[in-house]
Amino acid sequence: MERQYKVGIVGATGMVGQRFVTLLENHPWFKLTVLAASGRSAGKSYEDAVGSRWAMTTPMPESVKKMTVLDASKVEEVASQVDFVFCAVNMPKDEIKALEEAYAKAECPVVSNNSAHRFTPDVPMVVPEINADHIEIIPAQRKRLGTKRGFIAVKSNCSLQSYVPALHPLMKDFGVSKALVCTYQAISGAGKTFDRMPEIVDNVIPYIGGEEEKSEREPLKLWGHIEGDQIVNAEKPVITAQCFRVPVSDGHTAAVFVSFDKKPTKEQMLEAWANFRGPAQELNLPSAPKQFLHYFTEPDRPQPKLDRNTENGMAVCIGRLREDTLFDYKLSLIHISEPTRPEPI
């Protein structure tokens, strides 16, 4: 790509915004031009605005330390300086919806990590390897918003970015009929570190607000189809989920039990995973994993501590595939799929 796009981060001081800062450092396609946050941070240098809250494992890039943080609510000021923004604000959903639409109506495309617009019928919720074709809904969204260039696209919830990619290559030939999913989600998914979440030490919390509903509903939008001016959800598979917060810093784990319309052999499943390539791989996107799905043969893998950084944290790690007494198969998965890890860019 010859052109370098100017990008901004709206919500730059939070944990998700910090992750964007690290991922965009030295990115060949994008130049980080604007950092925006709440009015409390506006006018400060990024280093001062973040202060002791820098939560990444790598140091804050020198290139952003002295950048002046802008007020995210001053939409025109931010939008006029960038080609598009990544949005990672922490606000009530109605306020996020309004803010993201304001940026889109200012002809500034929005790529959002937030959940506010995930079920807006004409907003694509995209996992590039799964449903890149859903971006074709954008002209219909632009018509509704009255924009020529602006639009909103969102990423899916963190809990499903391991098991949906693992099931997807099996859908066409075998048909997934139902799945039971238990997720064991790292504290970074809550935007926390251990020193900011002492209640998780030596503990498991068997509830994450809203997470189970998202884990059951959002895959159906990802597997849905465009019909007119909206995305229509798929009718199956039926998914039931239980979500736990566990004392792990990064990397969500999932235990998945799955049944098929036509039961595959174990060898067919392994072959489907090994051969799967999505648009992100075909386009050779800078941060896309070369091999999206990795299968581990060891009986005690995958593990978050050992495997979460496979392919720079962008791969899905699968293991322990075996037949089940109630479902056809059961398996384990690991992915750094928390909100601080966006899709390949």
Positions of PLM-derived features:
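Histidine-centered active-site/metal-ligand motif
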Residues: 27, 252, 335
